[in-house]
């Protein structure tokens, strides 16, 4: 920077990585990986867990960068699905006919990514100190967790659970894309909001989850790369880079395991366990804040 002043986001990014050690990075990578693809909000848990353990909030930048591990996991797990969609899109462009299953899925992913990209740009432009925003307070996260848990429960109850990937259309991608944009609010859960939207559209549980994972690839990748770029421009040192690398690797491993487990689980189970968990999670946090056990930061 020519004026010697770094953007607030860069300073936050560096300080977040600097104050973590390797063990903490492994734990946070586990939290990120285990919760990124479950409908319980990885952002909420990455905020709450380190605060409860006395480590402080790792910040938006650290969270975004280690999400790259989750992206590598989802790219690896769904490599055949992605190849199928990409080939279908290329074929659709050549034939000028986008009615095929892979073309509809591909268009759903592309257009469904637009809302969260716009929302992310607006936040970066108008809320530069987002780390300290009231939306990231523990109380706000707890309330949002409860509300989204209730919405998931309503969707579970009302959904017909009949439609599979072969019946997925562009409109489903757009609907789930707008739901994904809500995940910019900490505690919403990108996986949870898109799964909820998919259930409202009548998708089968594992179908909604599968498309949710594919839909998240562009947005999470872009967010992670932008924050990584800011970190490198801010002049992060080798030790901090090592912490980020360990956190990202941990995130990759546990993300892959979480994806495999959730898809198997949703083939034979409903989502009520996640609904109950989210309500209890939010209730415990609010109770801890009310009793002074936990500081609302």
Curated annotation (Swiss-Prot):
One of its GO terms (molecular function) is undecaprenyl-diphosphatase activity. It is found in: Cell inner membrane. Its EC number is 3.6.1.27. One of its GO terms (cellular component) is plasma membrane. The keyword Transcription does not apply. Disulfide bonds: none annotated. Its main location: membrane. GO terms for biological process: cell wall organization; peptidoglycan biosynthetic process; regulation of cell shape; response to antibiotic. Keywords: Antibiotic resistance, Cell inner membrane, Cell membrane, Cell shape, Cell wall biogenesis/degradation, Hydrolase, Membrane, Peptidoglycan synthesis, Transmembrane, Transmembrane helix. Belongs to the UppP family. This is Undecaprenyl-diphosphatase. It comes from Synechococcus sp. (strain ATCC 27144 / PCC 6301 / SAUG 1402/1). The gene is uppP.
